[in-house]
Amino acid sequence: MVIASWLALTGGGSFAAPVQQEGATCSPSGTALSITAFDNKFDKRCLAAPAEMTFTIDFNNLDRGIPHNLAIYEDDSARKVYFKGELVDGPGRSTYTVQGLSPGKFFFRCDPHPEMNGTFVSG
């Protein structure tokens, strides 16, 4: 009975992507990054790569039948684009290769779902 109640409350043990807190910051730890889209959310609110170095992003879309991408912009106005990944229909995966960015903080989002967004740190 307790297990059945727990399963009902947790959605039957289905995958739930962790989400970092608003305003999360991060620092570069390498040139191979990863991010997952699930339930119209990213599992990370902050990504980071070393400045001026090409890096890859392993992009994993777990949302069945929903296209997502990752694009990096100067800020949340999304006027100046630095990188725009192709749309990936879910479930699906793609590896994006991104030319190095100058040092600073940038904005990333899913273009079809701009509420899916975060901070990109180049340092």
Residue ranges, per PLM feature:
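Short solvent-exposed strand-capping/beta-turn motif centered on an Asx-Ser/Thr pair
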Residues: 52, 60-64
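Beta-strand signatures of extracellular beta-sandwich domains
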Residues: 69-73
